[in-house]
Each structure stands twice: as structure tokens, then as C-alpha cells.
């Protein structure tokens, strides 16, 4: 999108949600544009062919020209984006802006009016790519309007290629999965369908999974085990010789606030307002899923963070640490 938004925990106050502004997306990782090499140049050239092929499938006669302009546009955007090295500094991507400041920052696009129109009622946003936003008017202007329309049209189709038709799906697979990531064959359709459903209603699947493989008793036993480990670790911190007393105090405080989630959420996701239809196409149902998810985002604006939520489903074979919440999560699988 030209300008998008999302609701996440405020980096400077993890108990409160904040509205974060996103910006133009790139068809390739920013490193491809920012770091010159033969392999990156080859990837950009193949990407341009891919973009042209999408436009051709959409019936555009001047597809090659549109693709060339879009890639040049993305190159210019990438020059202003944070590098991977800069992105490691969280302070560089934390730039709070009031609506008044945002209006002065970007003049050609009325972002405060846009946010209000789409239901986002906030008096402050956090901008990640502030360097790019300072130059937004160079990209969003009347001269670029045809290019912006093509850019948005392309991104709408390309981001849904796997859910539209076979030709688009094959194009997307051949470029992103096969060329960029080395995957030689598409996964079987049943596995792709399972992944899609898991992504949409993952906790509904998770509830079935834990009923069969991870009963409440198993969760209780794991929570008890983790509590013992925390107590043991606290004793270890107290006895180490290479830490100062002040450092030990901070470490013990962090450990005392350290949260562990095991198995599955105490409160399951509520899908009752997700309206799907057996008579609708896959894409039509996915639009309904998007509308449901959009409303969930709107509901978080201005509210405290719900720290009972999980970022993984119980059936996921993985684990994660969330530094903002100081929590570690072990799904049942």
C-alpha cells in the first residue's frame, strides 16, 4: 500500500497499544536494491520480468514499460529506507508523530483524514521509515498518479496470486519460491490448503490438537517444571562471581517478571464473528477473513495490550521469546 497501518505494543510502553504506520512495500528485500552485486542485479532483472508477466496476465499492452517504471520506482524508495544494519537500532524506527506533525511531514497525502476515514481514531502514530516519509511527496504526487495506480493494482494481484488462478499461482511460485528460495516443486494442494486454513483459524485447530495430545495435566506439569527452573536460575545468579551486585539485582528483577506460557492459551481466539460461506469462492472468503481481522485491529486502537494473546498456535513446532513482554512461549507441539 501507499500508506498502511497496524496496531502493536508501543516499544516505549509495552502495556499500551500504538498505531504504527507502514509505507510502500518492495517486491524484493531491500538488500537487493541497496547492495550492488551481480546476483542482486540478476534478481532485480528477473523481478522486472515477473512484474511484466503479471501485467500481461491482466491484459495490459504496455506491460514491459509498466514493469520498468515500477522497478525504478522501488529502487528510489529503497534508497531512503533503513538498511538492515540501521534497522538493528530500534530507536531509528521509533518516530512518534502527532496528526499535526504528520500533516506537515506529508502534504500530498492527507494521512490523518485517511486514518479517520478507515476508522482509526488516534491522535498519534509511530513512523518507522521517517527518512522515507520526509520525502513522501516526491513519490505521491499528481505526476506519479498513473504509476501509483499500477503499483497498487499490481500489489493487490501479486499478493493474492496463490488464491486467484493457476497461471498467477505458477508465476509467483516460479519467481519467489523456485528462483529466490530454491524450492523445486509446489507442495501438494492438500498441504497448501492445510497451511492456509491453519493461518486463518489456527487456534480452532489448536484446540482440537491439545484435546487429543496435550491435556490440562500436561500443561500443569510443565508450568511446575518451569517454576523450578526459574528458582534454580535465581540461585545461580546470586552465586555467580562475575556479576556486580547491581547487575545481579537487575537480573533477578527481570527474572521475577519473566512470564512463561506453556501449551496453549488460557483464552482461545473467538471466531464467531468471522462470516464464511460454502457458496463463496476462496478469494471471496479470504476477503471476509481480512475484514474480520481488520475489525480486530480497529478494536485494539487506544486499548491496553492483551498479553494473553499468543503469536503461535499450539500445534506449531517452535518456541519464541518476546522481549517487549519479557515472556517465553512453548507451544504444545
Give residue spans per PLM region:
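Noncatalytic, helix-rich "gating/capping" subdomain that lines the substrate-entry/channel surface
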Residues: 1-224, 228
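Intrinsically disordered, low-complexity linker/terminal regions across diverse proteins
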Residues: 76, 105-108, 126-130, 173, ...
